[in-house]
């Protein structure tokens, strides 16, 4: 048995390092959709209707009428290439009832695992570069890159994505659109193919903040209820009606639609996290971040430095917790109970049937190994292996449990820094210098000033060229994990966060980046109101 495990381990690692999922032909198109609704099927938009693109890990049934053929829900994977869901995700049904017309299912990193939307069985997603000639493609970010490009190109008014560690905000920052991740538990996850249950959050993308705010808070007609108020009994992580009312009662801006007048910035306190000013931060983004902060200050806002000591460990904790949950969620894909059955022989067949008991081993495991070898892409296999190891008895204490401890510390840092208390806590967090050892540097002992929002970049760089991304993926496939360094902390804490477009100037010329605002739990309504004002200010200034 041990010999068999050794052969399988060698086979898996060999496969992860050798197979690519994209081709030069596929890379020449933007490739933002996996499936589209035919144009002749789309009626003219009526009042209150809008075009909706849905990330292809969110279940849909027929496009816009029961007579039409259901679209597939592939998750960007060979395993689900022909899967048609018998039911529809709650969030899609909710948006249909508000006038959404589905235009297609968007491309993504397989099962939502990636930062550039290149780990997909349907070809890498790209965006046209602003810096150079239009033939040059740049990364669209991930994993909701297809949704971001669909909005940026004007093919959708609203796009749904999923944000596990930044998969809505990062593509929004790269493509120059707005990407919103609500508080964990606000929007239903029923019908979303899970990656990491404790982190997965449905997010929305649009060119402006207001269309997103109208869906979350309710329209100006005061008839359509905001999504924030809708509990889904089919989703165990959806906050109950009572909890929603209790949370909203402690917050502003939930009493009606977003005001038409800009939200006043005077006396609002924005925190600038010291730990986010990292060495890897692009000088052009650092300059634009500073310029945006200065502009807000000139309009009456207060800008103060704050310290979030534990967030420097957030990225490491995330890449322990998320793969661990993924390895469990993806165990059902075996080609027998769930997923496509692959019948063609693969190199795994020969490896499994080596040895004296080859036929017996073949009968036991060849179908399972063949399906998972052919069905999963490289990045998914990498995270499954990592997750399975961190959940093993040998690594549980040293990795998974410590990562969960870091997650609690990250959440505590955020709760201490915000002026508003977390409505899910019985008592507010307190900052105590005595809790920090003497070896901790002075900057980490800077007691957090209570702020309304945190202001920081969405990503440390602008969108890289796609050919450079693909080349780097070959040499160092985990280097892309660094792109999530500013988005992961809010995900670990379950906080609302939004990325708004910010123009930057670098050696290649003008480009787009994202400016991120993070709020306290369930402060989504005020966050959206402030984000609209900030987006307008940044657009005028930079």
Swiss-Prot record:
A GO BP annotation: mitochondrial translation
Annotated EC: 6.3.5.7
Annotated GO CC locations: glutamyl-tRNA(Gln) amidotransferase complex; mitochondrion
Subcellular location field: Mitochondrion
Quaternary assembly: Subunit of the heterotrimeric GatCAB amidotransferase (AdT) complex, composed of A, B and C subunits.
Family membership noted in the UniProt record: Belongs to the amidase family. GatA subfamily.
Role according to the record: Allows the formation of correctly charged Gln-tRNA(Gln) through the transamidation of misacylated Glu-tRNA(Gln) in the mitochondria. The reaction takes place in the presence of glutamine and ATP through an activated gamma-phospho-Glu-tRNA(Gln).
Protein name in UniProt: Glutamyl-tRNA(Gln) amidotransferase subunit A, mitochondrial
Organism: Neurospora crassa (strain ATCC 24698 / 74-OR23-1A / CBS 708.71 / DSM 1257 / FGSC 987)
